[in-house]
């Protein structure tokens, strides 16, 4: 980050008064553009004793199998995001269950949340970000 999104002045890394972390601070208007981890939300779509996985069509990890997941959008709950990602990546309708896992990956500034989800039917197919989708035991 080089310039302030509020006034366009240069920003510098320093510890603001009363803070404990070094942050970018605008040298003009003193705005602090806080940088926080991204939330990645997903679900574990279940049908009987099987799990629905998606083979990625895009980077990162193109061609590998994964659970449907993606970034939380503004104005949505984490449960809504989990259901949306299953719909976008696997055209799968699911009922969101309990939170299954929550873990931090500080080396890439991300926090992952996965919910259990029950597939409502077997009418699923690859979305734009998936090469194929399949149930696995």
Map each language-model feature to its residues.
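Conserved Nudix-box catalytic region and its N-terminal flanking loop in Nudix hydrolases
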Residues: 46-88
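Surface-exposed, flexible loop/turn segments at secondary-structure boundaries
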Residues: 12, 51, 59, 105-107, ...
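Short connector loops at helix/strand junctions that flank enzyme active sites
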Residues: 21, 36-40, 46-48, 60-62, ...
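Flexible, active-site-adjacent loop/turn segments at secondary-structure boundaries
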Residues: 31-32, 63-65, 70, 122, ...
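Conserved hydrophobic/aromatic beta-strand scaffold that supports enzyme active sites
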Residues: 3, 23, 44, 53, ...
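Short histidine-centered beta-strand/loop micro-motifs
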Residues: 35-36, 56, 124-127
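Acidic, metal-coordinating catalytic segment for phosphate/diphosphate chemistry
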Residues: 1-43
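Unchanged
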Residues: 72-137
């Amino acid at each position: 980050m080089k310039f302030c999104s509020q006034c366009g002045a240069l920003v510098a890394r320093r510890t603001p008064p009363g803070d404990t972390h070094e942050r970018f601070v605008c040298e003009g208007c003193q705005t602090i553009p806080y940088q926080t981890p991204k939330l990645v939300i997903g679900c574990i779509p279940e049908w009987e004793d099987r799990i629905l996985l998606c083979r990625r069509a895009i980077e990162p990890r193109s061609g590998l199998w994964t659970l449907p997941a993606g970034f939380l959008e503004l104005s949505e709950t984490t449960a809504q995001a989990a259901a949306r990602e299953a719909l976008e990546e696997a055209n799968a309708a699911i009922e969101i269950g309990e939170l299954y896992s929550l873990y931090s990956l500080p080396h890439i500034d991300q926090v992952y949340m996965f919910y259990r989800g029950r597939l409502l039917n077997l009418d699923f197919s690859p979305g734009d970000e998936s090469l194929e989708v399949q149930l696995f035991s």
